[in-house]
């Protein structure tokens, strides 16, 4: 029972990380600024997992975006909806850099967020792109 509750809170934390990345991108401000503002204004306080996830995605963003551009067949980063871009950034980060998160969980969580936050087509797109990256994972240079 505790595991499902933890998964639920982790899912919410991931959604909040997407919101932080989205806000930073749309407003053109650093992720750290959005985190600081939310830390000061949010009740209950911002979750540590959320903060770490958003920060780490931001730290690896250049390489993540290169990988998305390379493996998103028929799509450029600019053509993707902003929310999808940020869901994918989290998925790629968790898939390639978060060793404590199984690949299947990283993909399933990203697909779940796409279902919750984006268009009807987004879950299939997110699943396909992250699955392609998972297959390529052994040969990717990070």
Swiss-Prot record:
One of its GO terms (molecular function) is RNA binding. Coiled coil: none annotated. Keywords: RNA-binding, Transcription, Transcription antitermination, Transcription regulation. GO terms for biological process: DNA-templated transcription termination; transcription antitermination. GO terms for cellular component: cytosol. It comes from the Bacteria. Belongs to the NusB family. Involved in transcription antitermination. Required for transcription of ribosomal RNA (rRNA) genes. Binds specifically to the boxA antiterminator sequence of the ribosomal RNA (rrn) operons. This is Transcription antitermination protein NusB. It comes from Thermobifida fusca (strain YX). The lineage of its organism: Bacteria, Bacillati, Actinomycetota, Actinomycetes, Streptosporangiales.
